[in-house]
């Protein structure tokens, strides 16, 4: 079973320099100038259920692991098993809220100000408040409500399957099924 582990340095790091999207920034550099402590300590860990990848073929499983993002005292992960984004307190590991998505969430949300934005296999992009997970807005990001059978359930013909990126006041994402 996947285990989400947060070290003490992540809590201190999050206060100084957040990790607001997958691989840190719009360039997907996965790098920061933040210094690591000499001796990190385990702060908390959580058992999370295994995700449900979009494809059974292992080499196609782009979504087989949790991808956390951090802002302030919130750590967020998307879940393709539970069709939601889950927020945890970075100090205690306590679950703070769940924002339901009406479809699998396969990629990390992007944190923009006091909100988190994410897409799901239902073809929608949703914005929720970081404080409580309540919906600020939801937009159908695709041209129609057409559905197909995917992972033993109905999903959009154009699921939102690209981790969103925020840059210069805009959010970018991708929709569609691949490989064809």
Regions found by a protein language model. Name each.
Residues 19-23, 59-85, 102-126, 153-180:
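Repeat-blade elements of multi-bladed beta-propeller folds
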Residues 3, 38-41, 110, 165:
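Generic low-complexity segments that are intrinsically disordered, proline-rich and/or Lys/Arg-biased
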Residues 11-16, 115:
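Residue-level detector of intrinsically disordered, flexible termini
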Residues 3-13:
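Sec-dependent N-terminal signal peptides
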Residues 17-66, 73-76, 84-86, 94-101, ...:
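Aromatic (tryptophan-biased) beta-strands that constitute blades/sheets of beta-rich domains
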């Amino acid at each position: 079973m996947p285990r989400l582990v947060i070290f003490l340095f992540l809590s201190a790091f999050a206060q100084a320099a957040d990790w607001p999207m997958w691989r840190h920034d719009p360039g997907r550099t996965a790098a920061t100038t933040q210094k690591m402590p000499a001796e990190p300590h385990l702060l908390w860990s959580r058992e999370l259920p295994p995700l449900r990848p979009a494809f059974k073929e292992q080499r196609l499983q782009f979504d087989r692991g949790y991808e956390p993002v951090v802002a302030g005292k919130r750590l967020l992960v998307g879940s393709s098993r539970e069709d939601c984004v889950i927020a945890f307190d970075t100090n205690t590991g306590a679950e703070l809220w769940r924002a339901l998505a009406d479809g699998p969430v396969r990629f990390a949300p992007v944190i923009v100000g006091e909100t988190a934005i994410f897409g799901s296999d239902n073809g929608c992009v949703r914005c929720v408040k970081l404080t409580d997970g309540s919906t600020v807005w939801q937009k159908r990001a695709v041209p129609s409500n057409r559905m197909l059978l995917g992972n033993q359930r109905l999903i959009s013909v154009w699921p939102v399957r690209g981790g969103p990126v925020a840059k210069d006041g805009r959010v970018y994402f991708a929709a569609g099924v691949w490989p064809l």
